[in-house]
Amino acid sequence: MFKATTSARHRPGQGNSLSTLMARYNNQGLQRYSLKDKEHKIRRRKRSWGFQHSVILKNSWALPLLLTIVLPVIYAIHPVESKFFGHFILLSYRHGSVTDGMAFPVAQYKKGLWDLAFVAFYANALFLARKFIMKRLLRPLALKNNVSTMGKQQRFMEQMYTACYFAVMGPFGLYVMKTTPGLWIFQTHGMYDSYPHRSLGPAIKFYYLLQAAYWVQQSVVLVLRLEKPRKDHMELTVHHIITITLIALSYRFHFTHIGISMYITHDISDLFLATSKSLNYLSHRLQTPAFCLCVIAWIYLRHYTNWRILYSVLTEFRTVGPFELDWEAEQYKCQLSQFITFGLLATLQTLNIIWLYCLLRNAYRLLFLRIAKDDRSDTDKSEIEHGD
C-alpha cells in the first residue's frame, strides 16, 4: 500500500562533483602549503647565508694565520725535505747570477708555475696583516682621535692600511726602477730595448710577485664584501679585473719593465689619495694641503706619465727592440701583444679619468664650498656631512 520513500534521491554526477570539490580544496591547500614551504626554505637559506657570511667576517683571519705560521715553520724545521713548502715562501727557479757592471754577483730567476704558490702564500699573509693592522693598531688610533661612528672607523682603517702598504711599496718600487737599466724616471725606451726580459733579479721578481699578491688579496676583499661597497663599486671591480689581467699577462709574456712603471704610477698616487682621505676622517688641519698634493700627484702620475707610456706602446713598442712572434724563443712583442697592451692600458686610463673627475669635483667643494667629502663613498646615516 505504501511506497518506500527516501530522504534524498541520488543524482547522477553528484558524487563525482563532490570528489572534484574536495580534490580542488586539497590541491589548493597543498599549493598554499608548498608556497609557504618554499618561502620558509628561502628565508632559511637567507638566514643560513647571513650566518655563514657573519662567521666569515668574524674569522676571516683564521686561515691566513694558519698558513702564514705553519708553512714557514715546516720549512724552517726541514728546509731540504720541505722543498715543496719552500716554493710558497721563497723565490723559485734560480738559475745562476750576473756580474755585468755590478760590484758583486746578483742572482737571476726565471718564471714558472711555482710562482703562483708564492703569490697565494703572500696574499694570505697580506690578508692577515690587513686584519691585524686594522683591528689592533688602526681602530685604537681612530678611537683616540674621536672617530666615533662605526662607518667612519671602518673607512679610516681601510684608507690607513692602504696608505701603510703603499708607503712601503712606493719607495721599494722606486728602488727597483732605479736599479733597473733604462727605466729611471719613467724612461720608456728601456721598456723595450732589452726585451724579452725572461730572467729577473731577486728585487724585481719579489716586488712584482708581492704586488700581484696584494691585488689578489684586494680582489678577495672585494668579492667577499669585507669592505662596504662604494658608489663606484662597478668601476672598482673593472679596475681590479684589468689590474690582475695586466699583471698576469705582463709577467707571463715578459713585459715586466712596463709593469714596474705602471705599478709605481698607481702606488704613489694611491699613497697620496689614501693619506688625504685618512686626514679627512681625522678632521686634521693638513687635510686641505694633502688633498691638493693628491690631485697634483694623480694628474702627473696617472695621466701625464700614463699617457707617455700609452704613446710609447703606439710608437716605441714596434720600433725599439725585436718585433715578432716567436713562441720557441719566447718572443711575444708583436702586433697582437701591442693591441692587447694598448687596449688594457687605455681601459685603465678611462677609469682614471672617471676618478679624476670625482677628484676635481671634490677639490671644488673643498676649496670653494668648504665641504670635505668624497662623493665616491657611501655615507652612513649617522655620519655628519664631512664624513666619507
UniProtKB/Swiss-Prot annotation:
It is an enzyme of class 2 (transferase). Pfam families: TRAM_LAG1_CLN8. Keywords: Endoplasmic reticulum, Glycoprotein, Membrane, Transferase, Transmembrane, Transmembrane helix. The chain crosses the membrane at residues 60-80, 113-133, 166-186, 204-224, 241-261, 339-359. It is a multi-pass membrane protein. InterPro entries: Lag1/Lac1-like, TLC-dom. One of its GO terms (cellular component) is membrane. Its EC number is 2.3.1.-. Glycans are attached at N146. The keyword Glycosyltransferase does not apply. It comes from the Eukaryota. Residues 151-368 form the TLC domain. Pathway: Mycotoxin biosynthesis. Disruption phenotype: Does not affect the production of fumonisins B1, B2 and B3. Double knockout of FUM17 and FUM18 does not reduce resistance to FB1. GO terms for biological process: ceramide biosynthetic process. It is found in: Endoplasmic reticulum membrane. GO terms for molecular function: sphingosine N-acyltransferase activity. Induction: Induced by exogenous FB1. Its main location: endoplasmic reticulum. Sphingosine N-acyltransferase-like protein; part of the gene cluster that mediates the biosynthesis of fumonisins B1 (FB1), B2 (FB2), B3 (FB3), and B4 (FB4), which are carcinogenic mycotoxins. May contribute to the biosynthesis of ceramide via interaction with Cer3. Does not confer resistance to FB1. The biosynthesis starts with the FUM1-catalyzed carbon chain assembly from one molecule of acetyl-CoA, eight molecules of malonyl-CoA, and two molecules of methionine (in S-adenosyl form). PANTHER family: CERAMIDE SYNTHASE LAC1-RELATED (PTHR12560:SF11), LONGEVITY ASSURANCE FACTOR 1 LAG1 (PTHR12560). Belongs to the sphingosine N-acyltransferase family. This is Sphingosine N-acyltransferase-like protein FUM17.
